[in-house]
């Protein structure tokens, strides 16, 4: 939880930095006296920040923007500060020297986002439908036309957006935010500080069917999905993303998992802590993905696989076998003009015969 400062005024730079956890700041180099601002009211890019805002620079290629920025303070890398301090021109803004400026920016942005939230008492819109058996903490807000099923437990500071549908016996952790029109099926457990975006469907039935010739030739019989979905703390799930419940055991998203929009996670999957997936990824059922992995957009991962920790998959890659070794993996045919692609694709189809001919030529040349 960020440190609470005086709500009646913007914090000074030193007050703001003291309120940010993590010990990220190496030092602060003061700017010109007439450029200092008594209060920091927000954070912005170098181009958009005003004189009462702090900004950041993460790459030397943006150095040219420093001359025109209106920010009263800028977060900089140590090597960038070395360049600035060696300049003959006085630097008007203060510099916050930090090895991880993007992370410090994120934490300052989190602080401002949190600080603007007023203290809340229980607020349930008159059109919301809340089952009498549900347990609702005193600081929860529930928007218009939301539905809260029997046996639910909604913990402190949770926010349920308009039109959300929450099934029976669902638990939602403290300080979690459900944007409008999220659907959560029965029995799903969500940890603290989750952010679930609109259109997400959590805990729907997995794709489980058994061939049933007693019904008809080629017919399928449904396999009831008896497991649930368990989501850890600090998980964010993007708009229109779907995560299925397990067939027998639970589908699990561990702490810190980040899912972009329009992702599909099949039943019985386990996604390790702090793994992040970009948009339109599909993960088939019963696959385990380790911790700290990144999965590029539109990648497809087959079912019943085990992918280890610290594996990074490039966008558009099809993963069809286990991956045990950490590293970056790519399986994308290079983009090219269509005519060139057709020629290369034709060659790909002949690789086996070309290989045989090459071996024959090598054998003949050796004899």
Model-derived features: where do they sit?
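Structural signal for interior beta-strand "rungs" in well-ordered beta-sheet cores
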Residues: 56, 123-337
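Terminal amphipathic alpha-helical/low-complexity segments used for targeting or macromolecular assembly
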Residues: 1-127, 193, 199-200, 205-221, ...
């Amino acid at each position: 939880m960020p440190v609470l400062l005086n709500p009646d005024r913007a914090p000074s730079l030193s007050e703001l930095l003291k309120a940010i956890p993590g010990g990220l700041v190496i030092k602060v180099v003061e700017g010109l006296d007439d450029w200092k601002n008594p209060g920091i009211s927000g954070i912005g890019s170098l181009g958009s920040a005003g004189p009462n805002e702090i900004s950041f620079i993460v790459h030397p290629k943006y150095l040219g923007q420093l001359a025109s920025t209106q920010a009263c303070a800028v977060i900089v890398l140590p090597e960038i500060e070395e360049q600035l301090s060696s300049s003959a021109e006085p630097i008007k803004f203060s510099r916050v020297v930090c090895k991880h400026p993007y992370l410090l920016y994120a934490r300052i942005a989190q602080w401002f986002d949190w600080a603007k939230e007023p203290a809340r008492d229980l607020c349930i819109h008159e059109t919301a439908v809340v089952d009498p058996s549900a347990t609702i903490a005193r600081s929860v807000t529930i928007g218009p036309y939301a539905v809260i099923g029997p046996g639910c437990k909604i913990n402190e500071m949770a926010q349920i957006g308009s039109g959300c549908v929450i099934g029976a016996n669902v638990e939602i952790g403290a300080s979690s935010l459900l944007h409008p029109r999220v659907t959560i099926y029965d029995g799903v457990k969500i940890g603290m500080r989750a952010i679930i975006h609109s259109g997400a469907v959590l805990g729907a039935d997995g794709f489980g069917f058994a061939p049933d010739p007693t019904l008809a030739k080629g017919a399928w019989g449904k396999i009831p999905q008896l497991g649930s979905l368990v989501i850890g703390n600090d998980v964010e799930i993007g708009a229109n993303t779907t995560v299925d419940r397990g067939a027998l055991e639970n589908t699990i998203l561990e702490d810190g998992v980040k899912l972009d929009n329009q992702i599909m996670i099949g039943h019985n999957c386990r996604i390790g802590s702090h793994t992040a997936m970009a948009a339109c990824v599909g993960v088939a059922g019963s696959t385990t993905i380790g911790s700290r992995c990144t999965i590029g957009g539109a990648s497809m991962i087959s079912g019943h696989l085990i992918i280890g920790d610290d594996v990074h998959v490039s966008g558009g890659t099809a993963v069809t076998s286990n991956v045990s070794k950490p590293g970056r993996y790519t399986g994308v045919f290079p983009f090219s003009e269509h005519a060139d692609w057709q020629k290369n694709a034709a060659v790909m189809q002949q690789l086996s015969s070309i290989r045989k001919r090459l071996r024959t030529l090598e054998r003949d040349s050796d004899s």
